[in-house]
Structures are given as C-alpha cells and as structure tokens.
Design a protein with these regions (language model features):
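Membrane-anchoring alpha-helices and their flanking helix-loop junctions
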Residues: 1-140, 155-193, 197-226
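Histidine-centered phosphotransfer motif of kinases
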Residues: 140, 145-152
Length: 226
C-alpha cells in the first residue's frame, strides 16, 4: 500500500513542479509562493509532530513520514522554483562576483550531496526520502561529522545557485526563508521521527553529533594511544 502512496506522491510532486515551470512569470505570485511555499512547511511539520506524539509507533511513523515528506518536498520545490524566477527578474540586485564562483561551489556541494546519499545507502540501507527510508541508523563517514550532511550540502548548493545567477535576492531568500523552514523541519519533526524508529541508538548519536554544522568526531575513549 505504501508503494502505491509513494508512486502517487512522486506523480503529484513532479506534476506540481512541472506545472509551475510552465506558467507565465508573474512577479507578485512568485513572491507569494516563494515565501508562502517555504513557510507552508511549518504547519505541516506541526501536524506531523502531533500525529507522531499521539501514537509513537514505528509503523505509524513510517506512514506519517511518507505524507509529510511529499508535502515538504512539494512546498519547498515550488518555493525554490518561484524564488529563482524572482531572483532572475531583479537584475539590479546582482552580486558583484563572476558566476564561475557559484558554479564551482555548485559542483563541490552537489558532489557532497551525492556522497551523503551514497553514505546513507551503504550504511543506512535506504535513502532520506519516503520512497525508501533508511532501515539502519547511519552514524559514520559523513554522518559522524553532522547528523544532516545531505541537508547541509543542499543548502550550500542553493546558495551556490544564487551566486551563479548573481542574484542577491535569491541568496537572501535562502538565508532568511528556506534555511529557517528546513531547520524547523529537522528539529521539530525529523528528530522525533528518527527517535521513534531507532530509539536509544539515535538519542546517543544525537547527543554526540551536531545537527548541521560539522564537527570532528570524538575518538572512542578506549582507543589505544601510543
């Protein structure tokens, strides 16, 4: 049953994005969707958290997460599309840097996103998406430095897109709108969902590993020192 829901979620999310990409540009509508789409994540996160806390069971968490993920991806994807259009329509707010700076950062951060996905696939036996949620808790490699290496890399990638477009408005949108919305999702919803699915192992991992900003992993206390 969840496979069918995932299929419908992919079709719905992709359909919304394609529809927005094919709409004639309208600055006012784009601004509303760029801000409203990102902040629309907040009530969805609140509702998802309430559903998790009402019955903190693994199977329920999987179902709730499926719907929350597709809602979040649809809203954030729509907001990114519209924020890009707003940024490109404001040439007077250009960043005084060559676009190659943004392109180089896009390549590096994009590669890190792929590495984080591979890390999660190999160590967590899954993906960070509802279509194949991880079955094990990934705690090493990139995930030993930060609990969310993929999210961090993706946010840097978005800033890099703004630098590549030389759009001050887009970079400001990422910093002031997108990042806060993503952080609320991670802190309010995802941490609780992972705690339900992985229990004490996740709580211990959360205590020693930062949520976003990387930190060198602590060496095991019983490690032999020569």
């Amino acid at each position: 049953m969840r496979t069918l829901v995932n299929l419908l979620g992919i079709v719905f999310t992709g359909g919304v994005w394609l529809w927005l990409l094919n709409q004639p540009p309208d600055q006012t509508v784009s601004i509303i969707l760029a801000i409203g789409g990102a902040f629309g994540v907040l009530p969805l996160v609140w509702l998802g958290r309430r559903l998790l806390d009402a019955q903190p069971a693994i199977e329920r968490a999987l179902w709730v997460t499926t719907f929350v993920h597709y809602g979040v991806f649809t809203l954030l994807g729509a907001a990114i599309i519209e924020a890009t259009q707003v940024g490109m329509a404001a040439p007077g707010w250009m960043i005084p840097l060559p676009p190659e700076v943004g392109l180089a950062l896009m390549i590096v951060s994009g590669a890190l996103v792929l590495l984080a996905m591979a890390n999660l696939a190999l160590r967590g036996l899954g993906a960070p998406f509802a279509i194949a949620l991880s079955r094990e808790l990934a705690m090493d490699w990139l995930y030993a430095w930060t609990r969310n290496p993929m999210v961090l890399s993706a946010l840097v990638f978005l800033i890099a897109v703004g630098l590549w477009l030389r759009s001050t408005l887009f970079v400001l949108w990422v910093i002031a709108v997108a990042i806060p919305a993503v952080l609320v999702f991670l802190k309010v919803y995802e941490e609780r969902e992972l705690e339900i699915r992985f229990g004490e192992a996740y709580r211990e991992y959360r205590e020693k590993t930062p949520m976003l900003w990387p930190r060198r992993p602590e060496k095991p206390r019983n490690e032999f020192r020569g």
